[in-house]
Amino acid sequence: QADPAELGAARDAVTRAPDTPEPPQETSVFMSVHNGLHRNLRTYLLGLLDARLGNGARAAQYARELEAMPTPSDAGSLARDLAAGIRAESAARRGRPAEVTAAFDGVLRESWYEMAAASPFFGQPRERFVQAEALAAAGRDAEAAPLYRSLSGQGSLFELPYIAPAQLRLGEIAERQGRADEAAEHYSRVSQLWRDADAPLQPLVREARARLAKVRGER
C-alpha cells in the first residue's frame, strides 16, 4: 500500500503541472505519443490519486471531466477507458469488486499498437490488472485469466511490474482448477522473477514458494 503522504505529495505535484507543456521536437512515437493529451492525462492522474486517497466524490468529478474533454482523433477510446479506470480504482479502494467490474463494462482499449507499446496510458496495464483482480475475487477465473496473461511484458515495457503478480494469480487459478503442473510453472516463474526483489515485495515471493511446494506435493 502506498503511503498517503506520498500520494498527497504526488497529487500536489500533478496539480502544479502545466496542462500544455511545450511538445518535444522529436517525431518518435515514444516522444510524441502524448502530444495533445497532457490536459487529459493530468485529469486522469488527479482522479486516480484522489481515488487512491479515498476522495471518491472528487475522483468521480475528475472522471466526468475526463469523459467530456476533447481528444485527438487517433486517441481511440482513451478518455472513456481512463475514466473507467478512475471509477474502478475508487470501487477497489472500497473493497467492492462487483463495482470494479461494472466500471470496466464497455471499455474498448482501442489504440494503435505503437501507442500502446509506448505509453502506459494507452496500454493500460494497471487497469488490466485491477480488472483481473476484481474478476478473480468474484470467482470469474475464465475472464480474469486472459487479462493476467496479457501482462507478459511482450506488449510493452510498462507491463513488467505486473508480470510476477499476474503469474502468481495464474498459478492460483490453475491450482483451483486442478492443474498442478501448470500452477507449478507459474509459481516457479514468480520466484525466478522476484528472487532479488526489494523487501516489501518478498512476501509475494514467499507465498509463491509455499504454493509451489504445496502443488509439487500434490502431483
Regions found by a protein language model. Give the residues of each.
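Structural signature of alpha-solenoid helical repeat scaffolds
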Residues: 34-35, 71-75, 115, 119, ...
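"A position-specific structural signal for the A-helix of alpha-solenoid helical repeats
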Residues: 38-41, 45, 49, 79-82, ...
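TPR-repeat structural position
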Residues: 4-7, 56, 97, 141, ...
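Structural motif corresponding to the intra-repeat A-B loop/turn of tetratricopeptide repeats
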Residues: 1-4, 53, 94, 138, ...
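TPR/TPR-like (Sel1-like) alpha-helical repeat modules
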Residues: 15, 149, 175, 180-199
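Amphipathic alpha-helical segments of tetratricopeptide repeats
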Residues: 12-28, 64-72, 105-116, 146-156, ...
